Amino acid sequence: MASQVLVYPPYVYQTQSSAFCSVKKLKVEPSGCVFQERTYPQIHVNGRNFGNSHPSTKGSAFQTKIPFTKPRGHSFSLQAGAIVVKDTAGATKVLAAQAQQAGVEAPRAVVWRNRLHFLEGPQRCGLKRKSEELENHSGAMQIVDELSILPAMLQTNMGNPVTVVTATTGSKQNCTSGEGDYQLVQHEVLCSMKNTYEVLDFLGRGTFGQVVKCWKRGTNEIVAIKILKNHPSYARQGQIEVSILARLSTENADEYNFVRAYECFQHRNHTCLVFEMLEQNLYDFLKQNKFSPLPLKVIRPVLQQVATALKKLKSLGLIHADLKPENIMLVDPVRQPYRVKVIDFGSASHVSKTVCSTYLQSRYYRAPEIILGLPFCEAIDMWSLGCVIAELFLGWPLYPGALEYDQIRYISQTQGLPGEQLLNVGTKSTRFFCRETDMSHSGWRLKTLEEHEAETGMKSKEARKYIFNSLDDIVHVNTVMDLEGGDLLAEKADRREFVNLLKKMLLIDADLRITPIETLNHPFVNMKHLLDFPHSNHVKSCFHIMDICKSPSSCETNNHSKMSLLRPVASNGTAALAANFTKVGTLRSQALTTSAHSVVHHGIPLQAGTAQFGCGDAFHQTLIICPPAIQGIPAAHGKPTSYSIRVDNTVPLVTQAPAVQPLQIRPGVLSQQTWSGRTQQMLIPAWQQVTPMAPAAATLTSEGMAGSQRLGDWGKMIPHSNHYNSVMPPPLLTNQITLSAPQPISVGIAHVVWPQPATTKKNKLCQNRSNSLQNTNIPHSAFISPKIISGKEVEEVSCVDTQDNHTSEGEAGTCREASVRQDSSVSDKQRQTIIIADSPSPAVSVITISSDSDDEETSPRPSLRECKGSLDCEACQSTLNIDRMCSLSSPDSTLSTSSSGQSSPSPCKRPNSMSDDEQESGCETVDGSPTSDSSGHDSPFAENSFVEDAHQNTELGTCAGPEAKPAVGTAVEPPVGRESGLSVDEHMANTDSTCQPLRKGQPAPGKLHQPPALGARQQKPAAAFPQQHLNLSQVQHFGTGHQEWNGNFGHRRQQAYIPTSVTSNPFTLSHGSPNHTAVHAHLAGSTHLGGQPTLLPYPSSASLSSAAPVAHLLASPCTSRPMLQHPTYNISHPSGIVHQVPVGINPRLLPSPTIHQTQYKPIFPPHSYIAASPAYTGFPLSPTKLSQYPYM
């Protein structure tokens, strides 16, 4: 009997670097060689004996290149003698061994497959069905099951119930292979009852079918369609997958981080599932980066999101049963870094329908209860997740067993033997363990390699890169050597919590294993342990990254296309609140088109010729209102993160325009902005040496349109996380400002907007936060792709040692000076994308890490402080976007050896990367002491870019000391809550001001026009507490999100405080934050008079003396200045502590438009490097715990 198989072009089989569901690693348990490939899957021949017990060295002979010269649709008859092979999750493939012509001449056709290694033995290889079912090709066509009871979302099949139909070999249609796979042709049309999809590309072959990339006709949507096989052995599991997806379709896929299913339909007797298109799975991402370890700050959001998905699955009684890096997808690395979703529910089942002795999960991530044949539940997913995060941390699988014996052997050697009660109950315990009979007490022991080989004929071979005697030793792997001070302490504390959580996730006893909800409450995830390091830039970066990943639907409304930046400030997802704008002149400005990739806000245009922001920014930044005298962008970032940034004139930020018509803006009009609980705020994009970039087509809009749209819709509210139920906009500008009408003004939203998705789902994370204040609006920001990165940003990333092949912060710091002097043409040369081929990873050197600590270094520390600047430098030439990123691990590290040139194949070739003569070679012993690790400085996630800012640590204080002087500035606290239900206390900063000259006509700070409670609090500030756990004022360039993934972190920008005279009116805040259930006494006043400031104390400049480079920016205690309101930023500590970093600003550096600069005398002599221009600093936009707040 012959099958009709379509021959289709080679593009269908292109190796996928980004796919919804990439080709899966095969679960192979062969004889003779235990190594398998992941990129080039090993194939286990089922039911055939080729007399070859070793990997075939001629596997490539099966990769026949077919010149596709025949018209589409021509078929060829293939002999029935096909080779049946099995993939990882049980899917079968048919290799055409011989081809015959069928009516037309055609070249010999051999269906493309990955490199094959034929091995004998009828091993089931963890498959969910038996091989005998494969060969049951007799019988009539039959309907296996009907799935008529489905939600409306999935009942879209041409009016008929979903049927899984199978056909015999002799009667199957010519579009279906012998194993039930649908044979696709490019541009084939798949029709559901509602939509039509055109096949664009082949994405991957999975457990129960294949996945293709399709275009939804009539729209601009790209979807992924999973076409299930119609083989009878897959019918039941396909039905289960459809039913599970139907159940999940009623949940919020964005909130719970699993892939969204759109519809289900039938196409030629194949069930087709339509999913949202995702970008890249974690395994492909690791592979692109040569399996470099990821930093904990990047692992944490992945863990948090997957644990959230498992929490939901557990609540529904579902088991995913195939969690692995291949099934965790990056949603959109460009616009949503760190956002992941769980895919592939083809192996999922309900917990009540589990059967013991069932093979589930991929072997590397298979739980002990599955290996031993014990009853199992959702806890197997937690084991898999533990193995996944360990692999992300190590860059290599923790337990890469090629055989189940190897898998349980690795587990037992590191974590000890399973409990006797487990071995007694396990149905498969005797396969790997044997009872001791010559002992006084009966017990179990692991079979030796020789015993197992004698029984099974399979020879084990070491596949681990790291051999741990205990999971505690993981803490010493890939130690970051470039951190110091608070950053180093924070990293060590983070590692301890990570290992603590990992041990709980990898408990052999499933009953004791940590649950998803407990995981989410673990200190490693909620970062409570990092609150003890408020000045650490590592901590700030950790909080910042977690803020990003907690916005699941942030980009849905803008992820399809970038729109013109000149648009109404009011966004669709915001509440329709009217803004009190009267007597506001029109604005004349020019729209920056999308081709310029500007990062200004939607409603904040730039002039033509000033679009220097040709930088691929993963999220959109906004600008402050810059007085005409202030120009430039920062040229260096090596300053303490809590203070103002200096500005150079090298690259103008806002150019002046001739005054045509003054624009009168009422005081406080632009001040009613919301604080983002999601991300850090910013005022100016702080790229260094931005290449000038004019807009492609800048159009001059009419005054009426620009003015009415921008200002008329200003002030609407953005929904945020349900951590807060109120929005507290602080005053931004509290005095009148006169601007020229044609001059482009960059208004300081200082806010990254995370709107709700367009589709209405229940239980959103981003719920509307009620606001009883004046009607305000914050517009969406344009999503900018980081694939176009400014020269300055590239230079920050490009400080890479060619030998080390990874970016360290020390290098970035060294290159900072030189990068300022380079012209933009040099920067442009460094913006070429580097495509990294699937090069193998380093030699698989087995490193035994014992818990016995020695205090000796195993290798000298190479120099990390300079960049060669040559064209050979990988990172210097790359934009390092997240989906095409250089590998930045060191070749000379004994632990991070994953990118050396002579390396062995990476885990994609995972256990069988070494030849037989290489086995057991390269073993090294690394002591378990922290000092013995020699690869920390080579770790690809060394974040020394924040080392310069690590010298701000001061002692934490408690509220005490009634003798403090009145503050020299004002501060208001915006909310930055992390955990719901946390009590919040506050520690005010102790100020050391010795004299407070008052400006004429203004009251003394903290004394006049102050409520009694506030005045008392002002007179009794706490001890010096100028620290914070996470300063959202310090804003990182989002375009460097890919650097975070690869362990290279760009500098963070800071926000500017705008000093202005205060004209304020009282208003009432409706505060519903769980962190702030009570109003503090110092903020409880309700009798603020208009025009009078609410003052909170600032720390003295002495307490910030460690920040010498910005001493000129600190508040001068003896200098006259206007009374400012500087909102400060705080972190809600679980124990009820709020850490603040109020910042004093020398008004000389930022003159108010209504106050002349000569009225201020800086206490410090001017420095040559700041004399270029005035500077402005950043500030958060929303206070916290306020019942009355003056504005306007």
Swiss-Prot record:
Ranges of biased composition (kind: Low complexity): 889-906
Region (SUMO interaction motifs (SIM)) location: 843-895
GO MF annotation list: ATP binding; protein kinase activity; protein serine kinase activity; protein serine/threonine kinase activity; transcription corepressor activity
Compartment(s): Cytoplasm; Nucleus
Catalytic activity, reaction form: L-seryl-[protein] + ATP = O-phospho-L-seryl-[protein] + ADP + H(+); L-threonyl-[protein] + ATP = O-phospho-L-threonyl-[protein] + ADP + H(+)
Interaction with AR as annotated region, ranges: 767-921
Consequence of substituting residue 226 to R: Loss of kinase activity and impaired activation of SF1
One Pfam family hit: Pkinase
Main location: cytoplasm
Annotated catalytic residues: 322
Chain spans, region Interaction with UBL1: 847-857
Biological processes annotated in GO: apoptotic process; negative regulation of JUN kinase activity; negative regulation of transcription by RNA polymerase II; peptidyl-serine phosphorylation; peptidyl-threonine phosphorylation; positive regulation of DNA binding; protein phosphorylation
EC number: 2.7.11.1
Domain Protein kinase per the UniProt entry, residue ranges: 197-525
Positions bearing the Glycyl lysine isopeptide (Lys-Gly) (interchain with G-Cter in SUMO2) cross-link: 27
Summary of the function given for this chain in its UniProt record: Serine/threonine-protein kinase involved in transcription regulation, apoptosis and steroidogenic gene expression. Phosphorylates JUN and RUNX2. Seems to negatively regulate apoptosis by promoting FADD phosphorylation. Enhances androgen receptor-mediated transcription. May act as a transcriptional corepressor for NK homeodomain transcription factors. The phosphorylation of NR5A1 activates SF1 leading to increased steroidogenic gene expression upon cAMP signaling pathway stimulation.
Protein name according to UniProt: Homeodomain-interacting protein kinase 3
Gene name linked to the record: Hipk3
